[in-house]
Amino acid sequence: VLSLALAGVALAAHHAVKLSEKDGVGKFFADSKGMTLYIFKKDSPGKSVCAGPCVEKWPLYFREKVAVPEGVSAGDFGTIPREDGKRQTTYKGWPMYYYAGDKAPGDVSGQGLGTVWFVANP
């Protein structure tokens, strides 16, 4: 029984979304490894328009279920099907992405790019 409980804790940690904070950006979501998650303003709730070369620079974030930090509602996270057949995690309906230019946990190199890419804020 204990091993099952510990496996559940490990799974929750692996699928966790956490809050990070940086001067000039404020609070934002990151994955369990601390890599920043982004929102694309050309998307709409429930629909991603980032495809092809866009996805090479902005890889999809996908976890079927995520563990969330205190003060954040798990109900605000979901998943959507994409036209390419993949699935993507959403926050309040908005698809979430990584930025290929971020190399280390806490990097926010994609913030404000093209005035359409922004860190995913709670």
Map each language-model feature to its residues:
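Compact beta-sheet-dominated domain cores in extracellular/mature segments
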Residues: 11-122
